[in-house]
């Protein structure tokens, strides 16, 4: 691995997941019952032998701090490696100054002390697998100033509406980085992942500050498309951009498909996470489970279909959970039917017997709520 350090960036003001983000940043969202979203970029880095990682947090840090901790569970070299949690002074979700550039500026001293020649930047709100070692090698071999990672999609009219898209020429040179306006179905979605020299990165941060206090890294890179050699590299495999509530629900549901899960999880590419000591899930005689992901520590007496169930959940006798994402420590009472819902932690669904939302507009049940 060439000498590179990693940055896991936080989400900007244009990204907001209704309901769930009231309690924690997207990186701390539960994913597939067992993981947190931030586990994926950090694991990609440690699997690629990047053992100096900076994680940037711009609001509600407690959940990320508790989960990431010192980073020991991410298999970071304890002698040469280090995971830093860095914070922004602009912690209002909708603050116009709440940008990745402002977060980097607040921590410029830590950035300036990194003596690695290259930096790899990945977002805390996207789920995918990639070998950053190969990504960096491709960048260096090409001679480009900056290399951006993108994913080709054919549903950009309905999805990825809070993402940026790339304009590419025939040689995969980047001509523009612009918001997805939903006017074309085929787009190259920018995965907010890039590699460049550390010296260039720091100079871009300073230049962006002088141009506009609202500038993001994508904005300054877009300005530099004509003067810098910026190239795109296509990503293959599973990709989910968790930038709004429907995309969070859809990403969990998509991975119930075995083929999609195989594109994300690989035998020689582990996704690390903080482990919990809990007993195996108990399945009682009345339990009926189909095409679902069930975490440890649950008690299942009812029916679970096409759903993700977090740790320590209780599904009582006669209960039906269908097409839903249920976070940890939720109780679904007897004969309660929930469908097309995201149920946040510690909720108790006991009195209202039918909680069903339209399939095209899944519902959300608040954390620690009782229905």
Each language-model region and where it sits:
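Unchanged
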Residues: 1-254, 365
């Amino acid at each position: 691995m060439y000498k590179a350090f990693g940055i896991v960036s936080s989400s900007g003001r244009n990204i907001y997941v209704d309901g769930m983000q009231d309690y924690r940043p997207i990186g701390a969202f539960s994913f597939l019952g067992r993981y947190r979203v931030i586990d994926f970029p950090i694991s990609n880095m440690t699997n690629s032998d990047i053992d100096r990682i900076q994680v940037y947090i711009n609001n509600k840090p407690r959940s990320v701090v508790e989960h990431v901790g010192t980073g020991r569970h991410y298999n970071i070299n304890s002698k040469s490696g280090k995971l830093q949690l860095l914070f922004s002074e602009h912690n209002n979700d909708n603050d116009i100054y709440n940008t990745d550039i402002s977060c980097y500026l607040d921590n410029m001293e830590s950035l300036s002390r990194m003596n690695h020649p290259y930096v790899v930047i990945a977002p805390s709100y996207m789920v995918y697998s990639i070998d950053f070692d190969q990504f960096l090698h491709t960048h260096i071999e090409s001679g480009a100033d900056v290399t951006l990672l993108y994913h080709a999609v054919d549903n950009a009219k309905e999805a990825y509406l809070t993402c940026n898209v790339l304009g590419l020429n025939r040689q995969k040179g980047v001509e523009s980085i612009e918001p997805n306006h939903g006017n074309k179905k085929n787009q190259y979605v920018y995965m907010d992942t890039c590699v460049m020299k550390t010296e260039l990165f720091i100079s871009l941060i300073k230049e962006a500050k002088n141009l506009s206090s609202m500038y993001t890294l994508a904005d300054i890179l877009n300005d530099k498309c004509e003067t810098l050699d910026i190239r795109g590299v296509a990503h293959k495999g599973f990709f989910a951009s968790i930038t709004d509530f429907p995309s969070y629900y859809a990403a969990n549901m998509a991975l119930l498909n075995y083929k999609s899960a195989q594109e994300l999880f690989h035998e020689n590419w582990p996704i690390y996470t903080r482990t919990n000591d809990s007993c195996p899930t108990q399945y009682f005689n009345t339990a009926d489970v189909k095409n679902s992901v069930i975490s440890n520590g649950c008690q299942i007496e009812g029916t679970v279909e096409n759903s993700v169930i977090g740790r320590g959940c209780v599904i009582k006798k006669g209960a039906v959970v269908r097409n839903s994402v249920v976070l940890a420590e939720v109780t679904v009472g007897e004969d309660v039917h929930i469908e097309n819902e995201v149920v946040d932690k510690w909720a108790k669904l006991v009195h209202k017997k039918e909680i069903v939302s339209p399939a095209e507009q899944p519902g959300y049940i608040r954390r620690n709520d009782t229905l």
